[in-house]
UniProtKB/Swiss-Prot annotation:
PROSITE patterns: UVRD_HELICASE_ATP_BIND, UVRD_HELICASE_CTER. Its cofactor is Mg(2+). Keywords: ATP-binding, DNA damage, DNA repair, DNA-binding, Exonuclease, Helicase, Hydrolase, Isomerase, Nuclease, Nucleotide-binding. It comes from Staphylococcus aureus (strain bovine RF122 / ET3-1). Belongs to the helicase family. AddA subfamily. This is ATP-dependent helicase/nuclease subunit A. Its EC number is 3.1.-.-, 5.6.2.4. It comes from the Bacteria. Residues 491-786 form the UvrD-like helicase C-terminal domain. PANTHER family: ATP-DEPENDENT HELICASE_NUCLEASE SUBUNIT A, UVRD / RECB / PCRA DNA HELICASE FAMILY MEMBER. Residues 10-475 form the UvrD-like helicase ATP-binding domain. One of its GO terms (molecular function) is ATP hydrolysis activity. The heterodimer acts as both an ATP-dependent DNA helicase and an ATP-dependent, dual-direction single-stranded exonuclease. Recognizes the chi site generating a DNA molecule suitable for the initiation of homologous recombination. The AddA nuclease domain is required for chi fragment generation; this subunit has the helicase and 3' -> 5' nuclease activities. The lineage of its organism: Bacteria, Bacillati, Bacillota, Bacilli, Bacillales. It catalyses: Couples ATP hydrolysis with the unwinding of duplex DNA by translocating in the 3'-5' direction; ATP + H2O = ADP + phosphate + H(+).
């Protein structure tokens, strides 16, 4: 069917129009970010219904997520309703209103499930099957692996013994089990898992495949060797500019001869490379050269730098790719073959037994969905079954969204139900391989790439390819800068895609013509002398400053009204690779009172509160695990100090487990009695929880732990309290889900959690903030995919790529299989094998490529403005990045492959055209004006030193404040002196009014009202004169002797004023240390200690009120205030006979948005015979009712917020008002 002619005035671009109507062959639409992909997909579905008369239930629409499926179905339904209203007599449209509910617009998993439900008889399974929970599936697989390994231990095949010696330690086979699980998940992502496993051994047995691996390494080596040769030649050229360096030139000449031999004939001579030494040491530099002119000194530095680069590149090739002779590598492969074959056998046994267990329980998992669907749709020979043919007849078109995230099993399923070949098929695919960022979920971007390269624009003889390149989301500055970065960063070699004219973004949004350049901010860290903050904390602080700047100066353009509005919090998103920076950002935003939310369902198990709960569970399950036992002891729950742990271990240094050391310490007569009591209480708790766990489900054990130690309350009061609370509840809810499976017990639950951690699965914070809440958001790049924001701050650019998987002894790859290091069992030594070296190199290339795609996703989220935040320790590293080598239009391949982080690439690309000091051979273009508008960068690069812009509040960690900490004024500033003298000599013009007493204390008002309420006929005193008596130095600060009750009261208040609230209860020993600190600071006299009522303070420390204050979000001590009494009493503002109230509140704290005040009382009271505590409490409340009411009203007047209060009596306890 031909594409209809596009009418004038339609909203669709030519490419979109063709994507909507193209038919008659398989179609692949490469839809760049912001190009309207979803709108095109919906319109294509609608036109199939309206124009072609196809029923909606005869289309199969496959989406990546259930949410996308629901949104897609809703959009289609809305369009059908609109069309039906416009044409009410259309019977076809009325029919679609009914059929939309049966329409197959879903994820592929949902389609597979429906297929199984309809054809379960083919599979010979019970139709009453259910889908296993995540907990049940994980634990069942763990159990299966355990049983299969145990069976093979009984067999003790020599290959199995070698495997266990290579992949297990003397204490654990965890690594061995992990590799089995990884191989299982890799295998089931293939249409025929057994066949994939059988082929793992092929490279180890067949020389032809080994030759292919050698070629992979040779090709990679050529990249680095060529770069090394270039660096060597540059070093030679630079040394040639100098005098007195003949010896240096001779050394380099020798190196050039060696390198010429390696590169002879355009091929890499690997035997020659591995058989010779390279990188001879250069002679020492003479003083004459060092003292030459500045240009020569710079040339010398550059020459040495280039020679050093040459050596490092050669070393990389020899150490990473060819550390051993090729023949030795091949010999190792032959010895590894039996181990690889046996490992595949174990995985097949696991697969078979796992499937048997699932069938016995009548459960299916998501992998079963796909493989059972394939079983239904294919015959034994792999050809489509009769059922597949019936689906081919039924579905008139198959539409696949996010095709770049498809795996090979899903591709096979689609091929079974589509009609025709590529040149006459009915498969419509939409996606963007530049946004393929789910390789960890076994997504295979090569499926998209292969089709994109095979399909043509006109579709002659094959499928048809279309490019949606016009972006309707972002300003042109964002697009052109993004294009410039990727034009020089991404190609087929690194990135897997050529970022050419068809791949780049073209401006299509109707913004105004104002200039909004991209901002690359490079933060130079302050060292410890200039800031107490870590580098990450400095970056978080700097990000907050950027947010404040956006809110103050930036506007958001409304395309519909063509007008601007002020930026709000929700317009701003902070994107990072992971959530490692979340807590620092939360603290930084909290310090500035900016609403901030971490949109996190990742990084869950890294959170402090979750680690504490898991340490508790692990210690209860097995207290012989030192890491978790000690972690629990050091936590806020038990508060053991490092020196206490040291005392315990020193007494029994040879114990295998710390638990043994604890028991031995308790039983030692020389042990510290206080520490022994603390340890006994700790062990008593452990044993009590262990007993409880035997008779109660895990979720009840977690709940008891939370309640016993106020865990929820404590973490709710910290930074990010809502999220922390959600995390703790998330663990509790997961335990409930676990109990609903067929597994029970603490041990099994911990295994379930360990499996989630290992697989990178998260179930973290609940969504405590809605999409329309006005807060600044932080999210990962993965979670931002598909979203857009006016202002994007892409930070964490300097955080290195996570290459942890590359260091494993076994490397897995969907295309190549398994690369296992060689392990010499006799010598107990491991060496890289040919397969592990080659697959590791391939994996590193794929990792860097995916990281590039993550950068692309991050940059293309921005609508109005994009901020890139990098951080370095010093500016010297920037010069090295500016001089990064290039090759043609790209950063050199070797530089890209070894780039440690995104900043390394982004800065080196964007800085080249802005630096005048960079030679032409290191620039992409001599004149940036020559670059086309669509890829000409519009970027401001700012180098910022943190100490120059920091407005951080320097917090004194000292708990104490001394009365004599005064600053001295420096001499020499006469203007300042004159200003101060003028202020001191100033005569107040209304001096007579000062004789009118107008200031009253809250305590005085209390006495006045007590007089009035007692019935005294005295007229209310409106003027209370504060006497002119000299204030004496308190006796507890001066003379020794017996103190009066009021002096002791003042002393107690002083102690309480400085009492630390460290979110934990301090011990009596720590209290004495704290009092001694007050004495050392001269806040109280040494002899005052005997009059401090330690028992009463300890009672307060152990009270609930102390715990509440410790968990507060903010705490203020000894807060003075002065307020107009008219406001407090709600008197008319014109009343001139109104006084000013002044007072001092002992303590204020903020918890859950509510302000509380605390007033300490040292009063004694009369307990009449028979009086209950409740009656005494009422009496005390009444006594201070007036004063407390004024405190409450005053604070509410000042803060304009709800205020509550507490009275604390040292001789009675807490009273809440």
């Amino acid at each position: 069917m031909t594409i209809p002619e596009k009418p004038q005035g339609v909203i669709w671009t030519d490419a979109q129009w063709q994507s909507i109507y193209a038919t008659g062959q398989d179609v692949l639409v490469a839809a760049a970010a912001g190009s309207g992909k979803t709108a095109v997909l919906v319109e294509r579905i609608i036109q199939k219904i309206l124009r072609d008369g196809i029923d909606v239930d005869r289309l199969l629409v496959v989406t990546f997520t259930n949410l996308s499926a629901r949104e897609m179905k809703h959009r289609v339904d809305q369009r059908i309703q609109e069309a039906s209203i416009a044409d009410p007599a259309n019977a076809h449209l009325k029919n679609q209103r009914i059929k939309i509910h049966q329409a197959q617009i879903s994820t592929l998993h949902s389609f597979c499930l429906k297929l199984i439900q309809q054809h379960y008889d083919v599979l010979n399974i019970d139709p009453n099957f259910r889908t296993s929970s995540e907990a049940e599936n994980i634990l069942l697989l763990e159990q299966t692996i355990d049983e299969v390994i145990e069976q093979h231990y009984d067999i003790l095949d020599p290959a199995f013994i070698e495997l266990t010696e290579q992949l297990s330690s003397d204490r654990s086979d965890d690594q061995f089990r992990m590799i089995i699980k990884q191989l299982y998940f890799f295998s089931v992502a293939n249409p025929n898992p057994t066949n994939w496993l059988d082929q793992l051994v092929t490279p180890y047995e067949e020389e032809a495949q080994q030759a292919q691996l050698i070629q992979i390494l040779t090709d990679l080596s050529k990249v680095f060797i060529t770069a090394a040769y270039d660096a060597l030649n540059k070093a030679y050229d630079l040394f040639s500019m100098m005098d007195g360096v003949d010896k240096h030139l001779a050394v380099i000449e020798d190196e050039r001869r060696l390198m010429g031999r390696v590169l002879e004939g355009g091929f890499i001579d690997i035997p020659y490379l591995t058989g010779h030494e390279f990188g001879a040491r250069l002679p020492n530099i003479t003083a004459k050269i060092k003292e030459a002119n500045e240009m020569m000194v710079d040339a010398l530095k550059d020459a040495k730098l280039q020679y050093k680069k040459y050596k490092s590149l050669i070393d990389k090739v020899k150490s990473d790719y060819f550390s051993r002779e090729a023949d030795d590598l091949k010999a190792d492969m032959q010895q590894l073959a039996p181990r690889v074959k046996y490992l595949a056998r174990i995985v097949k046994d696991v697969m078979s037994e796992f499937n048997r267990k699932k069938r016995s329980k009548n459960i299916l998992d998501f992998s079963d969905y796909e493989h059972f669907a394939l079983q239904i749709l294919t015959n034994e020979d792999g050809s489509p079954s009769e059922i597949a043919e019936s689906y081919r007849q039924h579905f008139q078109e198959i539409l696949v969204d996010e095709y770049q995230d498809t795996n090979r099993v899903q591709e096979k399923i689609l091929s079974c139900i589509k009609t025709g070949d590529e040149h006459n098929g009915n498969l419509f695919m939409v996606g963007d391989v530049k946004q393929s960022i789910y390789k960890f979920r076994q997504a295979d971007p090569s499926l998209f790439i292969e089709k994109y390269q095979r399909f043509t624009i006109d579709g002659d003889g094959t499928g048809r390819r279309m490019d949606l390149s016009q972006n309707f989301r972002s300003r042109k500055e964002v697009l052109s800068t993004t294009n410039y970065i990727f034009k020089h960063m991404m190609d087929e070699q690194v990135g897997e895609v050529n970022y050419d004219e068809s791949a780049q973004l073209y401006y299509g949004a109707p913004y105004d013509e104002s200039d909004h350049p991209v901002n690359l901010k490079v933060l130079i860290e302050a060292d410890q002398e200039h800031s107490d903050l870590t580098g990450s904390e400095q970056e978080a602080h700097f990000i907050v400053e950027q947010v404040k700047d956006i809110l103050e100066h930036q506007k958001v353009y409304d395309m519909k009204t063509r007008s601007y509005r002020s930026a709000t919090y929700k317009d701003i998103v902070i994107l990072e690779r992971s959530f490692g920076q979340a807590r620092n950002l939360q603290q930084a935003f909290k310090n500035e009172d900016i609403p901030f939310h971490v949109n996190s369902r990742e990084g869950y198990f890294e959170q402090t509160e979750v680690r504490l709960a898991l340490s508790f569970l692990r210690a209860i399950d097995n207290p012989l695990q030192d890491i978790y036992l000690v972690g629990l002891m050091r936590s806020v729950i038990y508060q053991f100090k490092e020196d206490e742990l040291a005392q315990i271990r020193i007494l029994s240094p040879n114990d295998d487990y710390f638990y043994q050391s604890i028991v031995n310490y308790i039983n030692d007569e020389a042990a510290d009695a206080i520490l022994v009591d603390k340890l006994k209480m700790f062990l008593s708790d452990i044993q009590s929880y262990q007993q409880y766990s035997k008779d109660h489900p895990v979720y009840q054990l977690i709940d008891k732990f939370y309640n016993d130690h106020y865990v929820i309350q404590y973490f709710s009061g910290l930074i990010g309290g809502r999220g922390r609370r959600a995390n703790l509840y998330g663990l509790f809810n997961k335990a409930i889900e676990f109990e609903n499976s067929s597994f029970r017990g603490l041990y099994q639950f911990i295994r379930f959690i360990d499996e989630l951690i290992e697989r990178g699965k998260d179930f973290g914070e609940e969504n405590v903030v809605g999409p329309n809440d006005n807060v600044v958001r932080m999210m990962t790049i993965h979670s931002s995919k598909g979203l857009e924001f006016p202002f994007v701050i892409y930070s964490g650019l300097s955080k290195d790529f996570n290459k942890r998987d590359l260091k494993q002894p076994v490397i897995l790859n969907q295309q190549f299989g398994l690369g296992m290091d060689y392990f010499d069992v006799d010598k107990e030594m491991a060496f890289p094998s040919l397969a592990s070296v080659a697959y590791r190199a391939v994996a590193e290339k794929e990792l860097v490529s995916e990281e590039m795609r993550l950068v692309y996703v991050a940059l293309t989220r921005a609508k109005e403005q994009l901020y890139l935040i990098g951080r370095v320790k010093n500016d010297k590293s920037l010069l090295e990045l500016e001089q990064l080598s290039i090759s043609g239009e790209h950063i050199a391949v070797n530089e890209r492959l070894t780039s440690p982080n995104p900043f390394h690439l982004i800065y080196s690309i964007l800085s080249k055209h802005q630096s005048a000091s960079i030679p032409d051979d290191l620039k992409f273009e001599k004149d940036i004006a020559q670059v086309e508008d669509s890829s000409r960068p519009n970027v401001n690069i700012s180098i910022i030193y943190f100490e120059d812009v920091s407005t951080e509040t320097i917090l004194d960690n000292d708990e104490y404040r001394s009365v004599n900490q005064l600053e001295t004024m420096q001499n020499g500033n006469e203007d300042v002196k004159a200003q101060i003298k003028h202020q001191l000599d100033y005569q107040y013009p209304y001096v007579n009014d000062t004789k009118k007493p107008s200031k009253q204390s809250v305590s005085e008002l209390k006495r006045q009202y007590e007089t009035e309420e007692s019935g005294t006929s005295y007229e209310r005193v409106r003027q209370y004169r504060i006497g002119f008596s000299t204030y004496e130095r308190p006796k507890f600060l001066s003379e020794q002797g017996k103190r009066k009750a009021n002096e002791i009261g003042t002393l107690m208040h002083t102690v309480m004023q400085h009492l630390p609230f460290k979110k934990e209860r301090i011990s009596e020993v720590e209290l004495h240390q704290y009092i001694d600190g007050l004495i050392d600071k001269h806040i109280i006299e040494a002899d005052a200690k005997k009059d401090i009522r330690m028992d009463e303070i300890m009672t307060f420390i152990n009270s609930e009120l102390y715990s509440i204050i410790a968990e507060a979000e903010q705490v203020y001590r000894e807060l003075p205030f002065v307020v107009n009494q008219a406001l407090v009493d709600q008197l008319p503002q014109g009343d001139e006979d109104v006084s000013i109230i002044q007072g001092m509140i002992d303590l204020i704290f903020v918890k859950d948005g509510v302000h509380y005040f605390v007033d300490y009382k040292t009063d004694a009271f009369n307990r009449r015979r028979g009086m209950t505590d409740e009656e005494i409490g009422t009496q005390l409340k009444n006594k201070y009712k007036i004063q407390m009411k004024y405190y409450q009203n005053t604070l509410q007047t000042i803060l304009n917020k709800e205020v509550k209060g507490y009275l604390y009596f040292f001789k009675f306890g807490t009273l809440q008002l």
